[in-house]
């Protein structure tokens, strides 16, 4: 089910949204809140409920690694539907990353998209990850995935080739520049039952990149174990579609 909350400025839309989120959390429903504006308004309630407040911004130490292939619990789905159709998790992740880079580099041409695809495959291959899903498993830590690449690993491959150096130059902002906080391994709790993703300090092309990172994570979690109730709230949604 979908709900839209509308009203004039100051009518209490954010308050109503937060009240609904807190009541759902009290009922045991997993809650995700994405805040493109006024993220600080969710901080106090988030802390008081033991939630995870994730601030995605160049100045923040928080990071969700956009290149991470996340291990998801599909045990309940398998009980309901039987063994799933085997699909390459690497291929699915790379398709998502193509969307991320199309937002970051909107004028990318067809040749560059192909070269980017090859660079992404090579980046994961260097970590021992192939289209065989079993390659994701960490042989030194059973039950967990291997260490994932970060944007800096991709940058090193792109910058080494003249044909992909333009893409590397644009990506450099997120690797060595003012937004290098994106170039880290995930350092936040992604399993908390009350998660607020604050992207209010982002603007321009970084807003679209940050929104992708937030939605990519939320989508991964909502697909996990479908019988488990989850609620996704987006405050000031117009900021993202306007």
Could you describe each region identified by the protein language model?
Residues 1, 38, 47-51, 58-60, ...:
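P-loop NTPase motor domains
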Residues 1-58:
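Glycine-rich phosphate-binding loop of nucleotide-binding enzymes
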